Structures are given as C-alpha cells and as structure tokens.
Amino acid sequence: MTQKHLKLNNLNQHLHDGMSIMFGGFMGIGTPAKLVQQILDSGVKDLTLIGNDTAFIDTGVGPLIVNNRVKRLITSHIGTNPETGKKMIAGEIDVELVPQGTLAERIRAGGAGLGGILTPTGVGTVVEEGKQKIQIDGREYLLELPLKADIAIIHAQKGDMNGNLAYELSARNFNPLVALAAKTVIAQVDNLLEVGQLPPDEVITPAALIDYIVCSE
C-alpha cells in the first residue's frame, strides 16, 4: 500500500470538534457513506458541513444531522431531510442556504485562491441581505465570498494507488469540486487499481489533490 492508503479507523486522527467538512454527492449519491459513518462513530461534534444538500435521514450526511453533530450548514437544499428543517427552526443548526450554482462557484473560488465571485443571482431577494453589491456596466452583482474547509470527503467509483480518481455518472456531482478547496482531501474508493491500470483520459481528479484513500470494501 502507498502512504496515501488510510485505514478507516485512522480517519479519527484527522477529525476534531468544531471543524469544517466539505462533502461531495447529490442527494446522497456520490457521498462517501463509510467516511460519514466513521465521522459519526468518532464522536466529533459542532461541525460545519458544506455541500449541495443534506440528502435523507439515513442517507448521505443525514446521520450527522439526525445525531446532532452539526452546528452550521452551508448548502443548497434541505427539503428531503425533515430533520434539517426541524433543527433549523428550533435554532439547533445555523443554516445558510445558497443557490446551487453560487455554492459551486464559491467552492471553486476557494480552491483557486480567489477573493470571491460576482453573480447576479439573488439580487433583489433575501439572498442579498448583508452582502456587498457591485455595479458593472449598469448591472448589479453580489460579491459572494469563497468557501474552504479543513477536510473534504469524496467518493470515487475507481482510483489508483496514487490517488487518481474516476467517477460514475451523477455520482461525480460536487466531488471533483470540493477536492479543490480543503486542506486535507480523503477519498473513499470502490475499486482500487494499481498505478497504470486507470487510463489517463478517464481521470477526473488527479492524484495531486488527494491526501488519503480509503477502500470501500
């Protein structure tokens, strides 16, 4: 095994209370279930989660919501997980709802080292509250700040021992993106291949972005 190979129970050494975690996937598809479960089992709390949605009660990052491990949430959609809505209304979770495209670009900006992005999305709505507005060529834009995280957890359908990754269909959602914007990136890989077995033109996330690999099996 390479130095990037991480046993699941060794994930705990990268976790601490109050940390920020980005996650890939869409409605739980493409979210690394084993990594989520290990985070839950570790007992860490007061987490900030950044990702597209909170999936369902027992899917994706849902178990972290249900078991009161999350303090803050930056996401686009919470409607399929009723526990998220309940905890938001009760004041148990601070939820920042962000339009999906804006969320993606804020993460991308964080990964690219940019100071933010300008978008017309949300101008004239509650989304603009507390944000700087900039006018360019007669059109108003919101300045949206970049997003970064302590770790990103992603799920790949296959990858090699160096950490080059490929995804399957819609399971690709947000996974390559969050890998750009975290200090430490941990990938759950279903099919782990020897170096050279993954064709270069299939690689979506290059090994340089991956710190650790955890086998799904």
UniProtKB/Swiss-Prot annotation:
It comes from the Bacteria. It holds the Pfam family CoA_trans. Signal peptide: none annotated. SMART domains: CoA_trans. It catalyses: an acyl-CoA + acetate = a carboxylate + acetyl-CoA; acetoacetate + acetyl-CoA = acetoacetyl-CoA + acetate. Pathway: Lipid metabolism; short-chain fatty acid metabolism. The keyword Lipid metabolism applies. One of its GO terms (molecular function) is CoA-transferase activity. The keyword Phosphoprotein does not apply. CoA binds at G24, G25, F26, M27, G28, I29, G30. Its EC number is 2.8.3.8. InterPro entries: 3-oxoacid_CoA-transf_A, CoA_trans_fam_I, CoA_transf_BS, NagB/RpiA_transferase-like. Keywords: Fatty acid metabolism, Lipid metabolism, Transferase. One of its GO terms (biological process) is short-chain fatty acid metabolic process. PANTHER family: ACETATE COA-TRANSFERASE SUBUNIT ALPHA, KETOACID-COENZYME A TRANSFERASE. Belongs to the 3-oxoacid CoA-transferase subunit A family. Coenzyme A transferase which is involved in short-chain fatty acid degradation and catalyzes the activation of short-chain fatty acids to their respective CoA thiolesters. Heterotetramer composed of two alpha subunits (AtoD) and two beta subunits (AtoA). This is Acetate CoA-transferase subunit alpha. It comes from Haemophilus influenzae (strain ATCC 51907 / DSM 11121 / KW20 / Rd).
